[in-house]
C-alpha cells in the first residue's frame, strides 16, 4: 500500500506528530532523532529544510550550523560536502550541558532525500525555511515519490507557490492563517483556499490564538489544525477537546499515552 498524508488531512483524526523527530530525546532533525520518534510510535514527522549552495535540500532548522553542530557557517553559502561530516549530535544535551550523549557518534545533518527514503511509509510536514529552497524541495520530493505523503509548509506564501496545484498538498501560510482567523472573529465564512491544513503555534506575537474558533473555522472548510510545540499531555488533551487535530511534539511517547488514555475513558 502506498503511504499517504491521509492522517494529516483528516480533521477528525488526532495524530501525534514528532517535532524534528523525538527531539526531547535525540538531536533534532537527524536520522537518529527520527528513528527515536518512530520507536515511540509517532504517526507523522515534522522537519525543517534549508538549501545548500549546490542546491541540496538539507534537514536543519536554522540558517546556520552554529546552534546544532560543531561547525559554524551559513548553510546557503556552503556546498553540502563542506559540512557533510559536521557533528549534529555535538551540542545535544538533556541535562543543561553536564553530558552530551550523542557527541562523536557520527550524527550528521541529513539530506531531505535521505530522510524521505529511510522513512518511506511515514507522512511528513516539510517546512520550507527559506523561499530559495522551494524548488529544490519540490524536486527532491518528486524524485523520492513522496508527493502523496508530504504536506508542505512555510510561513512565507512565496515558498508555497510552487505547491499550489494538485496533486501537491500544502498548509496555510502565516498570512492565510491570519486571514482565516480574522474572518472567523467577525463571523465571516472563509474564502476558498489553496491550502488543506493549518500548522500553527499556540500564540502569534505573544497573543494566544483562540484555538476553538480557529480550528472550527478550518474544519468548516475541511482543513485540520495541527499545533506546535506541545509537550504537556494536559495541554494536548485540552487542544483536542477544542477541535484541534494533531499535536506537534518533542515527546511523542507521552502524547500518544495521553491520547490513548483519554480515548479509553
PLM segments and residue spans:
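C-terminal active-site rim and adjoining tail of enzyme catalytic domains
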Residues: 102-105, 174-175, 181-265
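Metal-dependent phosphodiesterase/phospholipase catalytic core, i.e.
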Residues: 2-8, 13-14, 61-167, 191-221
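Hydrophobic faces of well-ordered beta-strands that scaffold small-molecule active sites
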Residues: 16-19, 45-47, 124-126, 150-153, ...
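Solvent-exposed polar/charged
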Residues: 39, 43, 117-118, 241
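Glycine-rich beta-to-alpha transition loops that act as phosphate-gripper elements at the mouths
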Residues: 20-21, 28-30, 154, 174-176, ...
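Conserved N-terminal beta1-alpha1 strand-loop-helix module at the mouth
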Residues: 10-61, 66-71, 163
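Hydrophobic packing residues within well-ordered alpha-helices of enzyme cores
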Residues: 55, 137, 160-163, 239, ...
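Alpha-helix capping/helix-boundary segments
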Residues: 51, 133, 158-159, 235, ...
Amino acid at each position: 500500500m502506498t503511504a499517504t498524508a491521509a492522517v494529516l488531512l483528516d480533521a477528525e483524526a488526532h495524530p501525534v506528530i514528532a517535532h524534528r523527530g523525538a527531539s526531547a530525546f535525540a538531536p533534532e532533525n537527524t536520522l537518529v532523532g527520527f528513528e527515536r520518534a518512530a520507536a515511540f510510535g509517532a504517526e507523522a514527522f515534522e522537519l525543517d529544510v534549508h538549501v545548500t549552495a549546490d542546491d541540496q535540500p538539507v534537514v536543519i532548522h536554522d540558517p546556520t550550523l552554529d546552534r546544532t553542530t560543531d561547525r559554524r557557517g551559513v548553510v546557503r553559502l556552503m556546498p553540502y560536502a563542506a559540512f557533510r561530516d559536521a557533528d549534529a549530535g555535538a551540542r545535544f544535551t538533556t541535562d543543561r550541558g553536564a553530558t552530551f550523549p550523542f557527541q562523536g557518534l557520527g550524527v550528521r545533518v541529513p539530506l531531505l532525500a535521505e530522510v524521505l527514503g529511510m522513512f518511506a511509509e511515514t507522512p511528513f510536514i516539510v517546512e520550507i525555511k527559506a523561499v530559495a529552497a522551494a524548488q529544490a524541495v519540490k524536486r527532491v520530493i518528486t524524485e523520492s515519490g513522496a508527493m502523496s505523503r508530504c504536506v508542505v509548509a512555510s510561513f512565507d506564501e512565496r515558498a508555497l507557490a510552487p505547491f499550489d496545484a494538485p496533486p501537491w498538498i500544502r498548509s496555510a501560510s502565516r498570512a492565510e492563517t491570519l486571514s482565516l482567523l480574522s474572518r472567523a472573529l467577525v463571523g465571516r465564512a472563509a474564502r476558498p483556499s489553496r491550502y488543506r491544513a493549518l500548522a500553527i503555534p499556540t500564540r502569534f506575537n505573544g497573543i494566544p490564538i483562540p484555538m476553538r474558533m480557529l480550528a472550527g473555522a478550518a474544519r468548516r472548510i475541511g482543513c485540520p489544525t495541527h499545533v506546535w510545540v506541545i509537550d504537556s499531555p494536559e495541554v494536548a488533551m485540552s487542544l483536542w477537546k477544542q477541535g484541534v487535530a494533531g499535536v506537534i511534539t518533542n515527546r511523542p511517547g507521552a502524547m500518544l499515552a495521553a491520547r490513548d488514555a483519554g480515548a479509553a475513558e
